[in-house]
UniProtKB/Swiss-Prot annotation:
This is Putative uncharacterized protein YMR158W-B. Residues 1-27 form the signal peptide. It is found in: Membrane. It comes from Saccharomyces cerevisiae (strain ATCC 204508 / S288c) (Baker's yeast). It is a single-pass membrane protein.
Length: 106
């Protein structure tokens, strides 16, 4: 039973490291790409869920690096998606404001 303790502590350390790493990477991505904060956090919260499956494997350190590369590529996709979504969001908010303002504009 005692030989399981190091592996459990190693697993707990890897989980805490990945949570801390994900928090740092997410805050960096959200500030670097300057996306809509809600859109940014919603999309980036999916990435640690995908990456959490990697933490079960033996190569914890290498997976952190792989995870970072995965996050960078996801960031580029997500940030462009967030920009498109924010443009549509602003356009739809303008469209909802236009009908009441129509008599004033004409």
């Amino acid at each position: 039973m005692h030989h399981f303790v190091p592996s459990i502590s190693l697993f707990m350390a890897s989980v805490s490291f990945s949570v801390f790493f994900s928090h740092l990477a997410t805050s960096w991505e959200c500030s670097f790409f300057r996306s809509e904060s809600f859109c940014c956090k919603t999309l980036f919260s999916m990435v640690p869920l995908i990456n959490s499956s990697f933490n079960l494997s033996v190569f914890l350190f290498f997976n952190a690096i792989t995870s970072f590369n995965l996050r960078i590529s996801c960031s580029l996709l997500f940030s462009s998606f967030c920009r498109i979504a924010s443009v549509f969001n602003k356009a739809s908010s303008w469209l909802t404001m236009l009908p009441p303002m129509a008599p004033l504009l004409s």
